[in-house]
Amino acid sequence: GGSTMDASKAICAAAGHDGPAWDLVLDNSLVNDALPLMTVNTIAATGSEYDNSAVISNIETNEKLPLASDLLWPVVSFIDPAYTITVLARQTVAGSCDTMSHFMEQYFVKDISPVAEGLIEGILRTVIRNTPVVLENPGDLDARSELLWASTLGCNGIAALGSQASGWPCHAIEHEVSARYDITHGIGLAFLTPRLLRYFLEKAPEFLDRFAGFAERVMGLRADEFDSCEALAEAGLVKLDAFYKSVGVPAAGLAELGIDNTHFEAMAEHVEKHWFAPLEAFPVPFTR
């Protein structure tokens, strides 16, 4: 899974570094050499088997940060859906939610390539269609194959070619949450995504057509059944929320998840200081 593959990437990078491995996480430019890495993926989730980055947590400092270098591409990865059939239902769901978030981060940008738009919409439909299938029948190799192939394409840049770069704001926020609280990454993303997308829609009305297209082409709604684009866009987010709940994502608020505002200021400061992209790179205006 992602944690194992990402830890392996950090070990490969740190093998030739004369100092703590965390140095490399804080300053990715220090990665000057790396051991070759082979991965055998056993869950459809992070896409780390086909990208050059890792996410590393420091439990002593409550930090969860990216480590990226072109020296960290796996030399070879074995991607066999048969290895995923014993994944627990809750981890399968978390993996699908992670996959969806990877693509939505690259979809809700101000300028998207038509090719990327169609690719992402098709992948999102694939994940939404096949996740309930494997929950009902974990041994369905066809559905497992679709989920695994979808997740593998999430973070290697293919889905972003020709589009405006995204600062991946949902991941920036979720990393702060799961760095401090015991929340599975994919579930945290599923909790945050509908809320963040509503913020996008509120702050950037120019996204309305994108949201309407998402509602139609991803969530399967019909535009002629709604009085306005605004109503269609909101219905798409409602249906996204309903999908998450249907596959077992907890319908909870922050309080129910054991999260209060104690660390919000520190978390916001950490995003501003350490995230790989500045706040100005996010698709809509963000402030601490």
Range-by-range predicted roles:
Residues 9-16, 31, 160-162, 180-181:
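Alpha-helix C-terminal capping segments
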Residues 106-239:
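Active-site segments that bind and position negatively charged phosphate/pyrophosphate groups
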